[in-house]
Regions:
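Conserved Rossmann-fold NAD(P)-dependent oxidoreductase catalytic core, especially the SDR/UDP-sugar
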Residues: 97-140, 156
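C-terminal amphipathic/interface module of NAD(P)-dependent oxidoreductases
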Residues: 274-303
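NAD(P)H-binding glycine-rich loop region in Rossmannoid oxidoreductase-like domains
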Residues: 44, 48-94, 98, 102-105, ...
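Substrate-positioning beta->alpha
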Residues: 98, 176-182, 195-219, 225-229
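N-terminal Rossmann NAD(P)H-binding glycine-rich loop of SDR-like oxidoreductase domains
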Residues: 2-21
Length: 303
């Protein structure tokens, strides 16, 4: 049996739907909501309440052979929490370690932790990120994920459980939340955007590609105790992404040429330097390891 935490989230819903044909699947959710109604009837849903280092996982984890841990505190731009790092650590680090401990106690064979490409960093300089790069988390969210990775690795070395860590690039797909949703709204509401000269290289991963990789990691023997970066093979620029989103929404957004350096300066003056980095800098990911080691075959591009 496979336990998927956060099964009513964007990734979780797609994952449990994909897995149900080949595995017995159970999912945990904080509370029953409208999103749970969209889950397949064959998938058992267990309510755990808020995720913390005191969560009772007994019912959810009972009989599980594999745990795929998706649930966590998401990376939200303009987070207004007084101490975001503490909140991220409570959910993404401490609660994850607690779940891992429960997995060990219950004889789980493999624990798959969905981390973030942010662990590697938020900018590449002519060379794509690989699994061999030294981590350089540049946000509180990424730091909390990296701290979880380190502690999971230490704990796994002292147990018989197999650990797999996945660091996805920004995930896109139908009804994707977060930054993709923001950019999509901008692309559909603004007939003209100043991205005509933006030629950066950004890696993304489709929800379908990420789900197929997670499914491979459930059973593939070579995945044991490995870290994999998850991304589509071909990066796109912000200009290309806006054009794609505009096409999907059947609008006609025009990207006109405007100096990128001036947009960076304006963003910095407005306190939006991080947003400018997301729009204009490179963040390229090399997916070679997963393709070669696991035989993963991601469909490419925003097809």
């Amino acid at each position: 049996m496979v336990l998927v935490t956060g099964g009513n989230g964007f990734i979780g819903k797609e994952l449990v739907t994909f897995l149900q044909n080949d595995f017995t699947v159970r999912t945990s959710v904080r509370q029953l909501d409208g999103k749970c109604k969209a889950l397949p009837p064959s998938v058992e849903t267990v309510v755990t309440g808020d995720i913390s280092d005191k969560t009772n996982w007994n019912r959810a984890i009972d009989g599980a052979d594999v745990v795929i841990h998706l649930a966590g505190r998401a990376h939200i731009l303009d987070d207004t929490a007084l101490s975001p790092i503490d909140l991220f650590r409570e959910v993404n680090t401490k609660a994850t370690l607690h779940l891992f401990d429960e997995a060990v106690k219950n004889g789980v064979r493999r624990f798959i932790f969905v981390s973030s490409i942010g662990v590697n960093g938020n900018i590449t300089h002519g060379k794509p990120f690989t699994e061999q790069d030294s981590p350089e988390p540049a946000s509180d969210y990424a730091l909390s994920k990296y701290e979880a990775e380190k502690q999971l690795t230490l704990a796994a070395a002292q147990s018989d459980i197999e650990l797999v860590i996945i660091r996805p690039a920004l995930v896109y797909g139908k009804n994707a939340p977060g930054n993709i949703a923001r950019l999509s709204r901008i692309a559909t509401r603004c007939p003209f955007l100043p991205f005509g000269l933006v030629a950066n290289r950004k890696s993304f991963v489709s929800i379908e590609n990420l789900v197929s990789l997670l499914a491979l990691c459930i059973t593939h023997p070579a995945a044991s105790n490995q870290v994999f970066l998850a991304a589509d093979t071909t990066p796109v620029s912000t200009k290309q992404l806006v054009n794609i989103l505009s096409k999907v929404e059947e609008t006609n957004t025009i990207n006109f040429p405007f100096p990128v350096v001036l947009m960076r300066m304006a963003a910095t003056l407005l306190g939006k330097k991080a947003m400018a980095s997301q729009l204009f800098d490179d963040l390229e990911v090399d997916n070679t390891k997963a393709r070669k080691m696991l035989g993963w075959k991601p469909c490419d591009g925003f097809d």
